Every structure is written in structure tokens, then in C-alpha cells.
Design a protein with these regions (language model features):
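Core catalytic region of metal-dependent phosphoesterases/phosphodiesterases
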Residues: 1-95
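Conserved catalytic scaffold of divalent metal-dependent phosphoesterases
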Residues: 67-176
């Protein structure tokens, strides 16, 4: 977080970005919350949130155990930090706040949305493997994700028709 991520934050601020997205695996392995690396990461995310809204996507569970990212919205900052820990959509609103969909997607484009993000955090392949077998898990995940993504077509089309950009975010492994 000190050098690489810090440089990225410096560049985002210097270039005047409107928002920042971190698509998972903020660290290369799981860290204890009291570790110095988590403190550095938190300071950099806070510095970024002082500049623009921040969206963080849940990464690989071995790097970011579930719940790890929950501390980041609590850091404060001029702008909010939203953590997408589940499949769903979130809109960046005109006032710079985040508005998450109540379900897995929006039913209508939120009034005042600047952009709509479809968030696909990491999929627990072990759970899928337990249901379909290890040999078939990767293909099963692919089929389910394809079906899921097609379910977003309607709302994304409505957003584009309203000239609201749509952005797909994912964290995972591509097979095939």
C-alpha cells in the first residue's frame, strides 16, 4: 500500500479523477486488521476518499476474508466509500453518494444517477465444486455468470437510453 497503491492514489488525485474503483485483492494475502500494511492501505483509501467517491469490490477470499473490507466505509473522508461484497448494482449519484440496488439489480434507473455499476465480486468456487464436483466447477460458474449477466441487459439498456453510463466490474478467474 505504501509504494504501488500510494503512487496510484497520487496519480488519481493529480489527474483529477471523478471516482475510483478498486476491484479486489487490495493486498496479496490476508492481513490482520492491526498489521501496519492494513494501516497504510486504510490511510491511502482515506486519502482517495478525500478526493473522490470510492467503490471497492470484494476480492479473493484468501486475500480478503469476508468482512475485511467493512472497515473502509467507516474511515470517513469528503466522499463515501462503498464496498460491494455481494452481486448487485450500485449507482453513483449526482451528489457523489452511492445508492445500492435493494435486490440484485435496479428495477429502474435511479433518478439522478451519474453511472450504474454492475458488481460481480469473487465467486466462492469451493461452494460450486461442492454442488457440481471439482471437475465441473469452472464451467458451472461460467454458465451461471453468463445467465446472471444476461439478466442485467434490460436495466443496462434503459440506463444507456437515459445516457447514464453502465460499467461492469468483476473479480474472478476466466477459464476457457
Amino acid at each position: 500500500a505504501g509504494r504501488c497503491f500510494g503512487y496510484g492514489v497520487d496519480q488519481a488525485i493529480e489527474r483529477g479523477v471523478d471516482l475510483a474503483v478498486i476491484t479486489g485483492d487490495s493486498t496479496d494475502h490476508a492481513l490482520d486488521v492491526h498489521s501496519p500494511a492494513v494501516g497504510r492501505l486504510a490511510r491511502e483509501v482515506r486519502r482517495l476518499a478525500d478526493h473522490c467517491p470510492v467503490l471497492m469490490l470484494q476480492g479473493t477470499f484468501s486475500h480478503e476474508p469476508p468482512g475485511t473490507l467493512a472497515i473502509f466505509p467507516l474511515l470517513g473522508g469528503r466522499h463515501p466509500v462503498h464496498v460491494a461484497g455481494r452481486i448487485g448494482q450500485v449507482a453513483l449519484m449526482a451528489d457523489g453518494t452511492w445508492a445500492p440496488a435493494q435486490g440484485w439489480r435496479f428495477d429502474a434507473v435511479p433518478a439522478g444517477a451519474r453511472a450504474v455499476f454492475t458488481c460481480i465480486p469473487t465467486v466462492n468456487k469451493a461452494t460450486v465444486a461442492a454442488m457440481v464436483g471439482a471437475a465441473d466447477a469452472a464451467e458451472a460458474v461460467g454458465r451461471e455468470l453468463a445467465a446472471l449477466l444476461s439478466g442485467y441487459a434490460g436495466i443496462n439498456g434503459a440506463a444507456r437510453a437515459a445516457q447514464v453510463p453502465t460499467i461492469g466490474l468483476g473479480h474472478g478467474t476466466v477459464t476457457g
